[in-house]
Amino acid sequence: MRIKAVLFDLFDTLVIIEGGGAHYAPSLRKLHEFLRENQVNVPFEDFHKIYFQVRDKLYSESRESLEEPHFNLRISQTLQKLGYNFNAEDPVIKGATQAFSEKFMEYISLDPDAPQVLERLHGKYKLGLISNLAIPECAWKLLEKFNLKNFFDTIIISGEINRRKPSAEIFQKALKNLGVKASEALFVGDMPGLDIAGPKKVGMKAILIQRRPANNKMEIKPDKTIKRLTELLPILEDC
């Protein structure tokens, strides 16, 4: 069946996280600085220890449930364990999340191929974006910063709907928004366990953009593997 819709992952597909995980320590320090400025008097070492305990527990739960609680919950739970009574909607928590997000964004660059590829596909196919991120506001800011938002007919960020890839629901929601069948859609992403297994299980085609050494132990194989976004264009001509 002819492909009518092309959907993309965001991070390490359309935009690149520079330096792997190099962003995390400075982003967390920026978050902690904000908290200190707002009467949260906890040494960074203590905050760091409890934060990772909370984060790892939430990650473990998310791997099972495929839910994506907002990053705010991570911070509020950390502070509750440290003796502070903040809920996830408190302005201090939201400000701390924003501080983390702003530092993280300094480590993000646009894949130089992304604008031209999206420009070529826009109008010819329905376009969608599905991203796993617990700070959806950050994803929207990046899409604005790099002038990508207007290319897409649907944009789904996991932290907004409390579902994350590879859950069937997040892909099905995107397909419904685009008005296409799974067999008429193709997904492009860099993480085999999320961006290949997820769409393939609901009946979509999936293309892996290889940003790291090949994993030959993938349980579910991509339909194609590419190393640059521009390689997607001739593949679509044959679909």
Model-identified regions with their sequence ranges:
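Asp-based, Mg2+/Mn2+-dependent phosphohydrolase catalytic module
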Residues: 1-6, 16-18, 22, 41-45, ...
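N-terminal helical cap/lid subdomain that shapes the substrate entry/recognition surface
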Residues: 2-112
